[in-house]
């Protein structure tokens, strides 16, 4: 979930599509075609695409997205509403179909994902700045890592459940 200050940060960006965004999974085991992490089939309207209006979240406060939304300060909710209103309108226009819809979902995914990663980058920067300010940077080993990375549209996927090359790369930062 992007931090409020980064909501919409990449909304004007157009990201290159992976060559295999529309992979047909031919020549591989059935699991590749039957997986449950497809931008086309599995990407949810609420949690993944964030396509609920404030009114819809008020009507369904137990929805996972609603719970996150209503924990935000009011000013962040207003920013959220303005950033996602255009996305909701475009999706509900009914003009997005087939591969065009998958491409659109991919762009929304990348915009939100990179806005989220931007917050992680800034947080690491704050830790390093603090260590420098307190004179402890040269006395401290900083290690940041994570579990394996996400598929970023490769094979038409958005999660990280299979051991394919694309998601085996892991963030690793070491500062000493």
For every predicted segment, state its role.
Residues 1-139, 143-176:
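Active-site-proximal cap/lid insertion segments
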């Amino acid at each position: 979930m992007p931090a409020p200050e980064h909501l919409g940060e990449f909304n004007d960006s157009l990201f290159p599509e992976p060559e295999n965004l529309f992979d047909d999974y031919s020549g591989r085991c059935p699991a590749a075609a039957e997986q449950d992490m497809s931008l086309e089939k599995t990407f949810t309207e609420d949690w993944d695409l964030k396509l609920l209006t404030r009114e819809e979240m008020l009507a369904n406060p137990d929805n996972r997205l609603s719970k996150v939304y209503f924990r935000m300060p009011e000013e962040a909710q207003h920013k959220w509403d303005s950033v996602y209103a255009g996305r909701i309108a475009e999706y509900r226009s009914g003009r997005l179909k087939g591969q065009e819809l998958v491409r659109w979902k991919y762009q929304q995914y990348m915009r939100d994902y990179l806005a989220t990663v931007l917050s992680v980058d800034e947080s690491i920067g704050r830790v390093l700045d603090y260590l420098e300010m307190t004179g402890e940077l040269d006395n401290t080993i900083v290690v940041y890592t994570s579990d394996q990375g996400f598929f970023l549209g490769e094979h038409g996927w958005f999660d990280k459940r299979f051991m394919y090359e694309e998601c085996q790369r892991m963030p690793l930062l070491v500062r000493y």
